[in-house]
Curated annotation (Swiss-Prot):
<dbReference type="GO" id="GO:0003677">
    <property type="term" value="F:DNA binding"/>
</dbReference>
<feature type="binding site">
    <location>
        <position position="163"/>
    </location>
    <ligand>
        <name>Zn(2+)</name>
    </ligand>
</feature>
<dbReference type="GO" id="GO:0044781">
    <property type="term" value="P:bacterial-type flagellum organization"/>
</dbReference>
<feature type="binding site">
    <location>
        <position position="147"/>
    </location>
    <ligand>
        <name>Zn(2+)</name>
    </ligand>
</feature>
<keyword id="KW-0010">Activator</keyword>
<keyword id="KW-0963">Cytoplasm</keyword>
<dbReference type="GO" id="GO:0045893">
    <property type="term" value="P:positive regulation of DNA-templated transcription"/>
</dbReference>
<dbReference type="GO" id="GO:0005737">
    <property type="term" value="C:cytoplasm"/>
</dbReference>
<protein>
    <recommendedName>
        <fullName>Flagellar transcriptional regulator FlhC</fullName>
    </recommendedName>
</protein>
<keyword id="KW-0805">Transcription regulation</keyword>
<keyword id="KW-0479">Metal-binding</keyword>
<keyword id="KW-1005">Bacterial flagellum biogenesis</keyword>
<comment type="similarity">
    <text>Belongs to the FlhC family.</text>
</comment>
<dbReference type="GO" id="GO:1902208">
    <property type="term" value="P:regulation of bacterial-type flagellum assembly"/>
</dbReference>
<dbReference type="GO" id="GO:0008270">
    <property type="term" value="F:zinc ion binding"/>
</dbReference>
<comment type="subunit">
    <text>Heterohexamer composed of two FlhC and four FlhD subunits. Each FlhC binds a FlhD dimer, forming a heterotrimer, and a hexamer assembles by dimerization of two heterotrimers.</text>
</comment>
<feature type="binding site">
    <location>
        <position position="144"/>
    </location>
    <ligand>
        <name>Zn(2+)</name>
    </ligand>
</feature>
Length: 184
């Protein structure tokens, strides 16, 4: 019987170690406390200590935004759509748990955006929230009638949807803000 107890302790120590490593990765990627609490089994107090140790500061306070609107505005939609397409592609080809899939997809999104010298508009926490909105059926992907790309839209978007790249808003591309797309 003592062998079973020893195995159980080893399993729990290994599991806790995995949870700490997962939380550390999420913190380094900029995840907010709500993400850490949702995606790990560590206590709130433990997460706070880990966050302070890794980030060197206390975590941001306050609620996460609970609105799909951010993902539907012009530039944010382009970034959200790029991330979600990467996420969906990886989910079909890799057998990973949801958090590992999110981490890999976000790293690829970040890599793609930064290689084009554009600042990523989509934070890791917003990417997590986007996946939650899609899983809850609040957002989906719709094919653009012109270019054929898949873009984040509300659930019942028109079949004749035209994306923000094919039909940008009138003032699009005029901003000099970091991360802004410049249209020529």
């Amino acid at each position: 019987m003592s062998t079973n107890v020893a195995k159980a302790r080893v399993k729990s120590v290994l599991n806790e170690s995995r949870q700490i490593e997962r939380a550390a990765v999420l913190i380094r990627m900029g995840a907010r406390m709500q993400v850490l609490e949702s995606e790990t089994t560590l206590s709130y107090e433990r997460l706070i200590r880990l966050y302070k140790e890794i980030a060197g500061k206390s975590p941001s306070k306050g609620q996460l935004p609970f609105s799909t609107d951010w993902f539907l505005t012009w530039q944010e939609n382009i970034h959200s759509s790029l991330f979600l397409n990467i996420y969906e592609y990886l989910s079909k080809g890799l057998d990973l748990d949801a958090v590992e899939l999110l981490i890999r997809a976000y790293r690829l999104y970040d890599e793609q955006v930064t290689t084009t010298a554009i600042a990523p508009l989509l934070s890791f926490t917003r990417a997590w929230r986007l996946v939650k909105f899609v899983d809850a059926g609040m957002l989906t992907r719709t094919r653009c009638a012109r270019c054929g790309g898949q873009f984040v839209t509300e659930l019942y978007e028109s079949r004749h949807f035209i994306c923000g790249l094919c039909h940008p808003p009138a003032r699009a591309g005029k901003s000099r803000v970091a991360g802004a797309l410049m249209l020529h």
